[in-house]
Amino acid sequence: MATLKIETGAVATVTLNRPEVRNAFNDEVIAELTAAFTQLGQDSQVRAIVLAAEGPAFCAGADLNWMRRMADYTHAENLADAAQLAGMLYTIYTCPKPTVARIQGDVYAGGMGLVAACDMAVSVNTANYCLSEVKLGLYPATISPYVIRAMGARAAHRYFLTAERFDAAEALRIGLVHAVVTPDQLDDKVAEMTPALVNASPNAVTECKALLHDVAGKDINAALIARTVDGIASIRASDEGKEGVQSFLQKRKPNWLA
C-alpha cells in the first residue's frame, strides 16, 4: 500500500507513512486504512493491531490538497467523501482484533478520530492534541462519536468549542490516552501491553469488544440485561469458553496458547 507500511504477525503494525505531510489523510489513505483493518481483522494469525506513524507527527488530520478539492465539492460529493471517512473510523472501531494507537507525535483534527477509534492509546509526553476544526469554519462531526466516547462529553464541550491545544498529560487526564511515556520508552510500553492481548482467548477478546460497544453508555434495562445474559451463556458454551475453564481447572495452558 502506497501510504501505509504493514507488518503482519501475532501483533500486526499499520504505520501511516506520509511524514512529509505530517501523515495527513486523503481519500487514498482512507481507502488503504479501511482495507488494512478489514484484512487484518479477518486474519486468524493476527491477535492485535498497533496503529503507528512515521515522522514527527502522528496525524495532522486532512491533507491540504484534499481540503482544496473538498472546497469545490457539491453537497452530494461531500456526502460521499464524508461517508468514506466515517466508514474507515467505524472499521477501526469495530475491528474484531484489539487495537493500540502508538502516538509518537502531534495529533490534530481528524487524527483525533484515529486515536479515539482504537481500543487503547499510548502517547509520548511531547505530543500535543487539538480539535482544530472550528478555527476553519468546520466542526468535528465524523469523528465525534469516537472522540466523545473516549474523552467524555464534558471535556468534549471544552475542546470541540475552543479548539485549544492540550498536552499529553491532559489527554491522559481526560481519558483520551491510557499511558504517557518519554519517547525512548514508547516502544517498550506498547510491547508491555500487547502480550496480554495475544495471550487471551481470541474469541473472548472479539466478543468482549462487541460487548463493550453494546453496553457502554446504554441504559440498564430489560433489553440490555437480556443481551448480557445471552452473551455469557453463549460464550460459556463456546469451544474456547469450555477449553478455557477446563484448562484452568486442570492447571494447563489453553489450546490457543499451545
Each predicted region: which residue ranges?
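C-terminal alpha-helix plus adjacent terminal tail
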Residues: 1-12, 44, 163-169, 184, ...
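Conserved CoA-thioester-binding segment of acyl-CoA-metabolizing enzymes
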Residues: 1-54, 87-90, 187
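Terminal peptide-recognition signature
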Residues: 14, 18, 32-33, 51, ...
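Crotonase-fold acyl-CoA enzyme core
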Residues: 90-203, 243, 252
